[in-house]
Amino acid sequence: MSKRFLPITLVSALAIGSLTWSTTNEDALAKEKSQKSPEIRNVIFLIGDGMGVSYTSAYRYLKDNPATSVAERTEFDKYLVGQQMTYPEDSAQNITDSASAATAMSAGVKTYNAAIAVDNDKSEVKTVLEAAKERGKATGLVATSEITHATPASFGAHDESRKNMNAIADDYYKELINGKHKIDVLLGGGKSNFVRPDIDLTKAFKKDGYSYVTDKNQMLKDKNKQVLGLFAPEGLPKMIDRPNETPSLKDMTNSAIQRLNKDKDGFFLMVEGSQVDWAGHDNDIVGAMSEMEDFEKAYKAAIEFAKKDKHTLVVATADHSTGGFSIGAKGIYNWFGEPIKAAKRTPDFMADAIVKGADVEKTLKQYIDQNKVKLTNDEIKTVSDAAKTKNVTNIDNAIEAIFDNRTNTAWTTGGHTGEDVPVYAYGPYKERFAGQVDNTDQAKIIFDLLKKR
C-alpha cells in the first residue's frame, strides 16, 4: 500500500501526531530560550536496530526482580522522552527498511527503502556526520553488523542500494571533507568488504595514518585517534555467542569515545546495536534479549560519559521494529522470561553445531541449563527429527520453538513492522526530542544543534 493511499484513520492519527509534535517542540524551544542550556560539544546517537516497544518491554520483564512488587526500570526507561514515526517515502512500501530509516535520521530526508543517504531522485543528501566533520569535529561509526551495513552506511556513505557494501567501504575511504577522511573511527564487522581481490582498504587506511585492529586486545591497547577495527568477516557473533577476543558493543563504544574525545572541537558518534533486528528476523527470543543487553550496556556507557562531560547529548532510538514480537500468545495471559536465562548460546549456535554432526541431546543439554529448563523427551525428539533433514534452518526453528513455547512468545512475521518506536535522550537540549516526532526530526534537530557550536 502506497503511503499516499493511507486509510483515513491512519492519516488522522498522523495529523494528530504532527500536532502533538508541534506543541511539544514549541514548548521545548520556548524553554530553551528562557533557560540557558550548557554548551553542546558532542553528540552520541545510538540506534537499536529493530528495537520496538515489545523488545524494550520484554527486556524489562526479563531483568525484573521477582521478589519486588514492581518492575524495575531499565537504563532506557530512565531517559524516555517520546516516540517517533518510522514510515518511508516509497511508492511500493509503507513500512521502512533500515536504510531508509537511517537516511531519515542521518539526513532529515524521507526516501525509498534501500537508499543509503540519497533521496528519491538518487541525489546525495548531507548527513549529520558530514556536517559535524565540516565543523571540525571528530566522527565515528560503531556497529555489531558489518560497518558497511545499512544503518552505519547511511551516516557515512552514499549509494543507491544498501546491497553495494564494497562500494560503501570505498566511500568511507574515498569521500573526503576539507581534504580529510570524514570518519575517524570505524569499529564493527565486515572485513570481507575491505579486504578484497581488487583492493585491500585496510592497507590504504594504514598508509593514511589509521591503526588497524582485528581483536579486542588490539583495540584496547591502541590509542590512535583514527582507527579501523574489523572484528569479523561479516557481522559479529551475538553477545551470548561471542568469544573473548571479540569486543562487545560497550567495549567498542568506550574505545570510540576515548579516541574521539581527544578532539578539542568535539565529536559526533553513531552507535548501532545491529542484531536485535537480526534476531527479530529469525524469530529468536534468546538472541533478541542477548542483543538488548549488549545495547543497554553500550547505552549506559554513553550516558556515564555524558554525565561526567556535561557537554554531551545522548539520543537513543530504533529505526523500526522487527518480527511482530508478541509478549504472550495463544490467549494465555502470561509471559515467562526465566527460560531465556537457561540459554548459554543462541539457537543459531546450537543448530550450526548439530548440522555439522554434533549429537542433538548432548548439544541441547550442554547449552541449555538443565537446572533452569529441564528438556522433555518430546522437545529433544522434535529437534532430532529436524536434524534428520540436515537443514540448519529447520534445526534452528525447532530449538527456537522450545523457547517460544516455554516463554509464551509469538511472532507474526520474519520482516519489519510499522509501529512507532521509543526515543530516549539525555544531556543538553534533550527536551528538543520530546513528544511525538518523526524520524527525520532526529537529523533536523541535530543539524540545528551543530550550528550552536
Where in this protein do the model-derived segments appear?
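Bacterial N-terminal signal peptides that target proteins for export
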Residues: 1-9
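Structural motif marking the loop-to-transmembrane transition
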Residues: 2-3, 36, 40
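Hydrophobic core
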Residues: 10, 14-19
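Sec-dependent signal peptide cleavage junction
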Residues: 18-35
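A post-motif C-terminal structural segment
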Residues: 40-42, 51-57, 61-95, 99-103, ...
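Mobile, glycine-rich extracellular loop/lid and propeptide segments
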Residues: 40-59, 105-106, 110-121, 125-156
